[in-house]
From Swiss-Prot:
Ranges where the MTTase N-terminal domain occurs: 27-144
Positions contributing to [4Fe-4S] cluster 1 binding: C36, C73, C107
Binding site for [4Fe-4S] cluster 2: C181, C185, C188
Annotated keywords: 4Fe-4S, Cytoplasm, Iron, Iron-sulfur, Metal-binding, S-adenosyl-L-methionine, Transferase, tRNA processing
A Pfam family it matches: TRAM
Ranges of biased composition (kind: Basic and acidic residues): 1-10
InterPro entries the UniProt entry points to: Elp3/MiaA/NifB-like_rSAM, Methylthiotransferase, Methylthiotransferase_CS, Methylthiotransferase_N, Methylthiotransferase_N_sf, MiaB_methiolase, rSAM, rSAM_horseshoe
Region (Disordered): 1-25
One of the record's GO molecular function terms: 4 iron, 4 sulfur cluster binding
The name this protein goes by in its record: tRNA-2-methylthio-N(6)-dimethylallyladenosine synthase
Polar residues bias: start-end ranges: 12-23
Every TRAM domain range: 403-466
Native source organism of the sequence: Bordetella avium (strain 197N)
Catalytic activity: N(6)-dimethylallyladenosine(37) in tRNA + (sulfur carrier)-SH + AH2 + 2 S-adenosyl-L-methionine = 2-methylsulfanyl-N(6)-dimethylallyladenosine(37) in tRNA + (sulfur carrier)-H + 5'-deoxyadenosine + L-methionine + A + S-adenosyl-L-homocysteine + 2 H(+)
Length: 475
């Protein structure tokens, strides 16, 4: 489970914190974010609505915050206990600042609802992914009525109609184009925590992307639980825009130079989507396409809706359209009933397809899902051993891809200072590889060509491309 705070890193707790003394309208907000990019996007929107309504600004120190929010994820095991553990760490701040508001949002909030307040009465607001736009109202009601507020309803796409314009810094941005999931995989809680699939209107998405481009954004990542299931209403028409059509229109927005999207579903990878990789050069040569397993028996038990052969067929079509396409994927190891033979079929699929990265986990039972009722008789040590084998194979493939890039010419979007050395810069290739290199700060936010000189485990090193003579031989 991915975990961030806005400002991207949580602050440590001093032994003698001081109470917050900010006046209304000049306070601060601290958000800790768990989970996927959708949650990161939602956290940014929480800041936007509270900044516009109450003048709050971000802090990376919970001790100076007037509002503390936890944006939670319920995908992994023991997510609820993690939330209560984190809540316990900030409870003492209430005594120091009685006006402090503590809130829980995201998918755990959607699952647990009022049970969070019952167990942790010091929590002031509980809200779901679809009601984050109501945060200012919930906070006001909590302060006016003195009673904790809970709103985990599913008002479909309403939240996007109540969002202030995005305010971004940097050359990249997320744009949520749909919410929820209607696939109901047997292991997954998302349909129960985020609701059914609902797409934003076509023009709304294009307007947001165009506004971001006007602010200097060069790369957008289109977000959705099943992003390629997008079906957006076109204003003044009975026509519905599918995801391929949306990509075609985003591709034409001036200023946008790269388009990414996540997360996609193999069943929704239409022929028109495949053809987009041949026709739309701004669509990057990197795709996250979760497969989960390589055994047809396990895939059927997961209710994924495709076979291993069908998945490989989709990949073949995509790579025919874009030969240099690299893939990442999701894998669940130790799903109930998985045999050694099933696992070896997953390993064969990985060997056949080739992946650059993966998010792979040991199966964890999620209450309320159909898979929770299946007998889970695989010993934990066996699951962990399989996970290690799977990750080792993908790491081997990733290392080979990285090594193959040494000596090649790659176009980067320069995102900012390098995390390894603040005197250097960091950019990202089309296939999502981080490259550290020396260069002037004026390159930040721009595209630049580099020659890859070294490959490491989690990054590449390069130098800014010079003349053709000095770079002779670079592909």
């Amino acid at each position: 489970m991915h975990e961030t705070t806005l400002k991207r890193e949580g602050a440590s707790t001093p032994s003698n914190p001081t109470p917050s003394t900010h006046a209304a309208g000049s306070g601060k907000i601290y958000i800790r974010t768990f989970g996927c990019q959708m949650n990161e996007y939602d956290s940014d929107k929480m800041v936007d609505v509270l900044r516009e309504d109450q003048g709050l600004e971000m802090t990376d120190n919970p001790e100076e915050a007037d509002v503390i929010l936890f944006n939670t994820c319920s995908v992994r095991e023991k997510a609820q206990e993690k939330v209560f553990s984190d809540l316990g760490r900030v409870q003492h701040l209430k005594k120091l600042n009685p006006n402090l508001v503590i809130g829980v949002g995201g998918c755990v909030a959607s699952q647990e609802g009022a049970a969070i307040v019952k167990r942790a009465p010091y929590v002031d607001v509980v809200f779901g992914p679809q009601t984050l736009h109501r945060l200012p109202e919930l906070i006001r009601r909590r302060r006016d009525e003195g009673v904790s507020q809970v709103d985990i309803s599913f008002p479909e796409i309403e939240k996007f109609d109540n969002m202030p314009p995005s305010r971004v810094e940097g050359a990249t941005a997320f744009v949520s184009i749909m919410e929820g999931c209607s696939k109901y995989c047997s292991f997954c809680v998302v349909p129960y925590t985020r609701g059914e699939e609902v797409s934003r209107p076509f023009e709304d998405v294009l307007t947001e992307v165009a506004d971001l481009a006007d602010q200097g954004v060069r790369e957008v990542t289109l977000l959705g639980q099943n992003v390629n299931a997008y079906r957006g209403r076109i204003e003044g028409s009975d026509e519905i825009a599918d995801f391929a059509m949306l990509l075609e229109y985003v591709h034409e927005i001036p200023g946008i130079e790269r388009i990414r999207y996540t997360t996609s579903h193999p069943k929704e990878m239409t022929q028109r989507m495949v053809e987009a990789y041949a026709r739309l050069p701004k669509l990057v040569s990197f795709l996250h396409l979760p497969v989960q397993a390589g055994s047809d028996r396990v895939l059927a038990a997961m209710k994924r809706g495709y076979t291993a052969l069908e998945f490989k067929s989709v990949v073949r079509k995509l790579r025919a359209a874009r030969p240099n396409l690299t893939l990442s994927s999701d894998f669940i190891v130790g799903f109930p009933g998985e045999t050694e033979e099933d696992f070896q079929k997953t390993m064969k699929l990985i060997a056949d397809v080739g992946f650059d990265t993966s998010f792979s986990f040991v199966y964890s039972r999620r209450p309320g899902t159909p898979a929770a009722d299946l007998q889970d008789d695989t010993p934990q040590d066996v699951k962990l051993k399989r996970l290690q084998q799977l990750q080792a194979l993908i790491n081997e493939q990733a290392a080979a891809i990285a090594q193959s890039m040494v000596g090649t010419r790659q176009r980067l979007l320069v995102e900012g200072p390098s995390r390894r050395d603040p005197n250097e810069l960091m950019g990202r290739t089309e296939n999502n590889r981080i490259v550290n290199f020396e260069g002037p700060s004026r390159l930040i936010g721009n595209m630049v060509d580099v020659i890859i000189t070294h490959a490491f485990t989690n990054s590449l090193r390069g130098r800014v491309a010079g003349t053709e003579e000095s770079d002779q031989g670079a592909a």
